[in-house]
Amino acid sequence: MAGRVEVSRKELTKFCREAGFEPSPGMLEAIAGYLELLLHWNRSMNLVGTRTWQDTFHTLVVDSLHLAAFLDTLPLPPEPEVWDLGAGAGLPGIPLRAAWQRGNYTMVEAREKRAMFLRMALARHPLPGTNVFQGRAEAFMPSRPPADLVVSRAFMPWRELLDFVSGHLAPGGQVVFLSLDPVPASLPEGWAVEAESLYGTRCGGRYFWSLRPIIVPN
């Protein structure tokens, strides 16, 4: 492949360890392969704003590794139903699934080219229990079992997302947000904080919040 991006596995291992994670061989290969594919197709599809695999790791992929650790602290079923709404180019989803493979994880993406890229990435490095749905979330949610976990990076403003998914959560279901800010002091009525985590990156501090309905809506 002309102009193929090559990710140094040695350097990637070093970056993972610096962030506090010891990558397994399978996890390392999945993340490296994803970065190579992402940066190659980024030239024509404008998938992400970064231009080198190193910058992409430090600004985007590292969030997925921290997210995997955060999800392990949450009270989830052994095999949760997980929705990644507005999955885009697969961040956080694909690196997350390289590190955290519980349950059934569906990346929902309405844009055809991005959904095509997600399928291409999974065809190159299959990840257990990981799927792509091309279409609008409104069409996806009624067709699935209720979600134990919804993940959102920038699908829609957080208050709107809570309203959007509230009728589709399983008992004990949670919505996890990736944010640059701490969880707001005031939440919509009927919602509570399950957990919050601050973590550091080369780009500064970032947050995860997990919110849950106090009473699951009917």
UniProtKB/Swiss-Prot annotation:
Positions contributing to S-adenosyl-L-methionine binding: 86, 91, 137-138, 153
Keywords associated with the record: Cytoplasm, Methyltransferase, rRNA processing, S-adenosyl-L-methionine, Transferase
Molecular function as annotated in GO: rRNA (guanine-N7-)-methyltransferase activity
InterPro entries: rRNA_ssu_MeTfrase_G (IPR003682), SAM-dependent_MTases_sf (IPR029063)
Subcellular location(s) per record: Cytoplasm
Catalytic activity: guanosine(527) in 16S rRNA + S-adenosyl-L-methionine = N(7)-methylguanosine(527) in 16S rRNA + S-adenosyl-L-homocysteine
Principal location listed in the UniProt entry: cytoplasm
Highest taxon listed in the record's lineage: Bacteria
SUPFAM superfamilies named among the record's database cross-references: S-adenosyl-L-methionine-dependent methyltransferases (SSF53335)
EC number: 2.1.1.170
Pfam families reported in the protein's UniProt record: GidB
Gene Ontology annotations for the cellular component aspect, listed alphabetically: cytosol
Protein family per UniProt: Belongs to the methyltransferase superfamily. RNA methyltransferase RsmG family.
Function: Specifically methylates the N7 position of guanine in position 527 of 16S rRNA.
Name recorded for this polypeptide: Ribosomal RNA small subunit methyltransferase G
UniProt source species: Nitratidesulfovibrio vulgaris (strain ATCC 29579 / DSM 644 / CCUG 34227 / NCIMB 8303 / VKM B-1760 / Hildenborough) (Desulfovibrio vulgaris)
